[in-house]
Structure formats: C-alpha cells, structure tokens
Amino acid sequence: MKKHILYSFRRCPFAIRARWALRKSLIRVELREVDLKNKPLDLIKTSQNKTVPLLILNNGLVIEESLDIILWSLSNSNVADQKKYLPSNFENKILNLIRENDKEFKFHLDRFKYSNRFNDVNKDFHFYQAKTIIKKWNDMLEKNFKRNFWLVGENESIADWCIWPFVRQFKIACDHQNISNYFDDPMIQWLNYFETNNFYNDV
C-alpha cells in the first residue's frame, strides 16, 4: 500500500513534534527531509504555507499544521492512546497550553534566539519573557512531580509532545549558561526524558 509522505526538517520543532506523534502512534510514513533554502517543487505546489511539516496522506489529503498532524495521528491510533494522550477531562487545558507555546512562547523564543533577524528587538527582554513562561511550566511540573512526570494530568499528553521541542531550543540558545540558572529540577528531568527516549533518535 502507498505510504503517507511527510515533508520535514530535522531541527524544526514543529516538525519534531509531528514526527514524534506519528512515531508514538505507530504510523509509518515516507520521510522527505527538506532543504529550506531549496524547497522541492512538490512541497511548494501542495502547501499553502510552503513550509514543513507537511503530511500528504496516501489518499491525497494534505495536512499542513503540526498540531493537525498530531490530532490526525491520534485519531488513527487505538482508542486507549486517544484517551491517554488527549483525555477529555483535560482537553481544554492541554490545547490552551499548546496555544501558549505556539503563540506567546515561540514569539519570545524567536526574538531571543534569532534577534539578528528582527529590527529594534531587545534580546534580554524576550529572554526574560520566555524564561517567565518556562518558570510557569516548571511550576506545573513541580506541582505534579510527586505523583507523575507531566504537564497535565497523570499521563504524558500531546501538551508534552508539543512543548518539549521548543523548550529544547530555549536550552540550546542558552548553552553558554548553567542549565540550573533557568531550569529547575522537574523541568530538567522532564526534558531529559524526551532527549534520552528511544524514540528521540528516530525523530
């Protein structure tokens, strides 16, 4: 049977989380790594956004947003996984956390990590704003830490999947500093879970 096709870029956090969800959902795809400076014509023709990740299903349906790819992956996994990774009683909280990451945190992360790409940007201000959000997430992890390991509820959820690649980028951008300056122990262990997971090298 014809495989689904995923256009991806290895270091892109949106693409990382899409690949993670597909891997966790045991959905096999034909992975096509993209040179962002020389995008393939098929991607340009197919995608309105003209960027990654882009999933083309074997029936021709196109899914462009990473969160939509994640939700599609879950909908095509078993019912137990759907309830585990997006439990109905925490769905709104999970989706709101993802929105906070995708809108607010990424806005400040980009202007801290890539400050030379923006005009009149105060790098330190955006670092502080990103760090404040990190602290909020760390407090959520710490609150749950004695009972479990996750941002929301008792199990790993798509909130964890969606946010950890961006926290990793923040850590990389701060690599000249001691990690304990901006991450407390729960956040360090949470991120370490993903970076040392057997799936990590696969995605």
Predicted regions: what they are:
Residues 111-113, 193-203:
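Charged/polar, low-hydrophobicity segments characteristic of intrinsically disordered regions
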Residues 100, 136, 165, 169, ...:
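Alpha-helical scaffold segments in carbohydrate-active enzymes
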Residues 126-133, 181-196:
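Extended, well-ordered alpha-helical scaffold segments
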Residues 39, 90, 154-163, 183:
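Short, conserved alpha-helical segments within structured domains
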